[in-house]
Amino acid sequence: MSEPLLRGLAAGDPPSATGPVTGSADKVADVLIVGGGLVGGTLACALAEKGVSVVVIDGEDPEALLAAGYDGRCSAIALACQRLLDTIGLWDLLGGESQPILDIRVVDGGSPLFLHYAQAEAQGPMGYMVENRLLRQAILTRLGRLPAATLLAPARMTALRRDLDGVSATLSDGQTVRARLVVGADGRRSQVRESAGIGIRTLGYGQTAIVLTVEHERSHRGCAVEHFLPAGPFAILPMPGNRSSLVWTERSDLVPGLLALPAEHFQAELERRFGDHLGWVRPVGPRFSYRLTLQAANRYVDHRLALVGDAAHGMHPVAGQGMNYGLRDVAVLAERLVAAQRLGLDPGAPALLAEYEALRRPDNLLMLAITDALVRLFSNDIAPVALARRLGIGAVERMGPLKRLFMRHAMGTLKLGPEPPRLMRGVPL
């Protein structure tokens, strides 16, 4: 018996039930991935490298995605996730265009107290900053070299059907794709998630992030700085050369006015928050903005269906972990799908999908709770809260073991509970 299914997506029709998946298909694969962004593309590379056949459907034109002005964002890649990217052959394709994060300073407004994570304590980089555009390029290059991978882009899915034996997607050009499992990697407004009737919980913060790249007079020396201001965090993230990526969080009602400011007035607002520790500073390229919310799917799996990345969980960037937790999903799901393929097992088996959800959902929910608490704690200037917060920062700075625990968690190398997935330990599948 078939599941409730998604039809007429382009026309905005509600999901409707269909009959069994029948007939021939233009493309046949083990796994269909809807969404070829950073998380979906990485999953495709991890699977195809080991001979699991994948078809990736993405609605964006690859050429547009690689344009310097597409979205302006960068990602902080934790050390464990860098190991994943390296193990599946993506890291070398960046051509050295990444910036090691050697130090992290957390500052609470104008307080003299701060938290400093030093390279010496981490015994190496804590992570890396990478332009999303360059990571997309690496993914596209890698997919093009893997015979088991097929990318259909730009392509729009108009129907998704699931039955006892598999899934079938129909595209706007009439092509059909048949697979044994569909993975929704299609972001916060996931069509795959909606097709399964999986609900979401959303929390708003009344905050919007302004994202831009700046160049500055002095070297950042690989140091990432996060200032917690009353309106939200102001993060200065090191990029190659004398450049940094800014994630400037403001009240949403103020952002349109800031974005509309003439260059010299915007520069003044920027300098007021940035400070002079890197000498002069000036914007390079356009300004972008993104509304900040928390979003959590009520479940991650359904019949022959799994969700990864933002389709399953979307978090505030206060801790810089959104991309990393999507890659954790990739590591866990890829390990199980590759193992199933080697044993001749069904990649859409309920037990496999249940194990994926059991391993990932609690971890993601914990990080969602942590980021939510951080936003509410550090965006609160009520005197007793501010005092407790500053004392807490000072105390953690003086407590070496606790500070190192927080540092290892941010790096993705903290070992609590089950052993981390193979890819995050740098072990091939």
From Swiss-Prot:
GO molecular function: FAD binding; monooxygenase activity; oxidoreductase activity, acting on paired donors, with incorporation or reduction of molecular oxygen
Region (Disordered): 1-22
InterPro entries on file: FAD-bd, FAD/NAD-bd_sf, Ubi_Hdrlase_CS, UbiH/COQ6, UbiH/COQ6_monooxygenase
EC supergroup of this enzyme: oxidoreductase
A GO BP annotation: ubiquinone biosynthetic process
Record keyword Disulfide bond present: no
Top-level taxon of origin: Bacteria
Cross-referenced Pfam families: FAD_binding_3
Record pathway: Cofactor biosynthesis; ubiquinone biosynthesis
Catalytic activity entry: a 2-(all-trans-polyprenyl)phenol + NADPH + O2 + H(+) = a 3-(all-trans-polyprenyl)benzene-1,2-diol + NADP(+) + H2O
Family per similarity comment: Belongs to the UbiH/COQ6 family.
Full protein name: Ubiquinone hydroxylase UbiL
Primary gene name: ubiL
